[in-house]
Amino acid sequence: LQIAIRHPEIVDKIILGSALAKRNGVPDWFWDFMKQAKLENMPEQLKTAYKQVAPDTSGLQVMHDRDAKRMVNFKDISDEQIKFIKAPTLIIIGDKDVITPEHAIELHRQITNSELTIIPGGHGEYIGEITTIKPDTKESEFVVPIIEKFLDKKTE
């Protein structure tokens, strides 16, 4: 969102996966959770994946703390800034996502040239996020053709 707002000249298309533009786009418990975030509570799959690409584990704590602080200090993106986005935009969330359907619908209404897709599953499940993968996971099979169709569309 920020790149499309700040540098529209370099953005041809946007795919917003579980994007948050307003604090009220998630339930109140989310903000309490982020204030209490601790590395010990981070899913093991994410810690393992981090260590596979960055063996210096001290960076994991730094990344975690910065991400948590960034979320705690999150500021709403104004309606004017959102409405300024002109690039074709695909908005995707899961039907059990932490991002509320109402928030995704509001983004869709504010971004003139947008499409909205709500896929079965939780946060990130539709793209095979590592903590959601199960033997019978098929959600990414829904979203890949939707993304390909969106990206293949000719823009005016």
Model regions and ranges:
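Flexible "cap/lid" loop of the alpha/beta hydrolase fold
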Residues: 1-6, 10-46
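Active-site nucleophile elbow and catalytic-triad environment of alpha/beta-hydrolase enzymes
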Residues: 65-81, 95
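Short beta-strand/loop motif that positions the catalytic acidic residue
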Residues: 84-85, 91-93
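Catalytic active-site module of serine/aspartate enzymes centered on a nucleophile-bearing elbow/loop
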Residues: 120-156
